[in-house]
Amino acid sequence: MIRIAIDCMGGDFGLPVTIPAAIEFARQFPDTRLLLVGLPDAIEAALAERRDAPRDRLDIVPATEVVSMDDPVEVALRRKKDSSMRLAAQAVKDGRADACISAGNTGAWMAISRYVLKTLDGIDRPAIATSIPNQTGRATTVLDLGANVDCSAEHLLQFAIMGAALSQAVDHRDRPTVGLLNIGEEIIKGNEVVKEAAELLRASPLNFYGNVEGNDIFKGTVDVVVCDGFVGNVVLKSVEGLAKMLSSVIREEFKRNFITLLAGAFAKPVLNRLRNRVDNRRYNGAALLGLRGVVIKSHGSADAYAFGFALQRAREAVASKLLERTAQTVAQITKRVQSGEAVAPGAAGDTA
């Protein structure tokens, strides 16, 4: 039985999203038990509205406080010690849950998770990773997405190790290729941190492809793309904005006149398939890698459909033993790097 603790109060919408998503998820996956963490009376009232809720696998964990989306990290971490967010992470720490998930304040969730669970040996900073759909029909894992604005070359190497472990565990890639996001493929491109990180990656046992550019994320050139949190967050928000704009433009164009409406009717099956491939809700659920527990961050504005996919990400991470694989991969590669062992980098993106 896979146990997932949910911060039911987090996000822009809270219970109207988390409870319906939890119920549908529990019905879809009978091998899961959900810990619903939050204000008990409010959760009980929300569950009472759904007669189809599998109550035998939905456990309410009472909390007396809620971390709001605009709470400073210090307030969430030091003052709200009985918050639904804090208790969800604590459930993993205590062994009562295998994973935890929140749609709440990203900075607070990262700080609380790191404080409660601590980082893995060999990891200085956790990183946020998610999947972005590409033209191959699969997805590219990208990290960091905002947890670490300023990074050293060593941090980028650690992100690459964790990203490769995530790709192996969840996406079932035997030896995932890793690319370093840069302004060009040439080894002379980039700032000093990126250049130094590239040298560390070339000397590591990872399957390092070389430098990649932003368009390579969507081409599926590599399995994992590594960058600092500042760049990664800009990439993520740009992708989300572009997807919404394209969807809006396509809708407007097909509604322009009778002919375009007719064309839209014929094109509807194709458009539906396209929508499913690029719908960012289907890729909701970023993993906070490098912690001693499986921690998932849902988008704050997620609806119940999107939050359900974040729950699926948590379930997949536990089922694929992501935590154990990440710890093992970090230990193995750290040992090999310290011993001076290296492999030849992939030359495709490693041009002069």
Swiss-Prot record:
InterPro entries: FA_synthesis, Phospholipid_synth_PlsX-like. Catalyzes the reversible formation of acyl-phosphate (acyl-PO(4)) from acyl-[acyl-carrier-protein] (acyl-ACP). This enzyme utilizes acyl-ACP as fatty acyl donor, but not acyl-CoA. Transmembrane segments: none annotated. PANTHER family: FATTY ACID/PHOSPHOLIPID SYNTHESIS PROTEIN PLSX, PHOSPHATE ACYLTRANSFERASE. Its EC number is 2.3.1.274. It comes from Bordetella pertussis (strain Tohama I / ATCC BAA-589 / NCTC 13251). It catalyses: a fatty acyl-[ACP] + phosphate = an acyl phosphate + holo-[ACP]. This is Phosphate acyltransferase. One of its GO terms (molecular function) is phosphate:acyl-[acyl carrier protein] acyltransferase activity. The keyword Lipid biosynthesis applies. The gene is plsX.
